[in-house]
């Protein structure tokens, strides 16, 4: 419902201008040939080694099971519960965290010239890296619920209105002023997804609601989404406000 009628889906492009336009209008863009064949081979090899080692050592993080809601990492007392995110608890996908500590090939991604240019164009001159993680998607995983990666950002509101305090917001509880001010929050977060394998409709690629980054709202679970697709070596950059899962 947010995508203009005459718009078309972003396609993998080597043009910085086209990627910037897609990002602004649709909420995401696809950079073609972002990774060379040698980079792809090195990244796959190192990631496979690391993922296997973490499974063998017994601390692999695995999610995507029917009772494993993304974001429910703590119990009612606020304690982490890693025992709930294991293969034994139904986890299908494997997350490999903290890639900054797990190989130079992962560090090299952080200095990719074109992607850094796109990030700077969206966020400005100064920003922080908050996560560098791999997700190995396997058959049988449950689809992630639609969410934004900027859910913690309070939206603009009216003077005198008592909204939900920022510290009480969560992925499931957020402040939506039913009387729209016409203003939306700026982007303050972005994600880059490096496709080490082809992303298709059928293999669990990220789903997005096009243009939803301009809605000024948190997700409507009934919104129509599309699968982001692209060949191996493509990089996808997403505005932190876009609805995705």
Segment roles from a protein language model:
Residues 1-25, 32-169:
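Non-heme Fe(II)-dependent double-stranded beta-helix
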Residues 30-32, 128-131, 207-208, 237-238:
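A structural signal for short, well-ordered beta-strand segments and their strand-loop junctions
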Residues 230-244:
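Conserved metal-binding segment of the jelly-roll/cupin
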Residues 117-118, 141-229:
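Catalytic core of non-heme Fe(II) oxygenases with the double-stranded beta-helix
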Residues 103-108, 179-180, 223-224, 245:
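Active-site rim elements
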Residues 34, 131-134, 195, 211, ...:
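Short, well-ordered beta-to-alpha junction loops that form the rim of enzyme active sites
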Residues 39, 200, 216, 244-245:
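Flexible loop/turn segments at secondary-structure boundaries
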Residues 27-28, 233:
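Catalytic palm active-site di-aspartate
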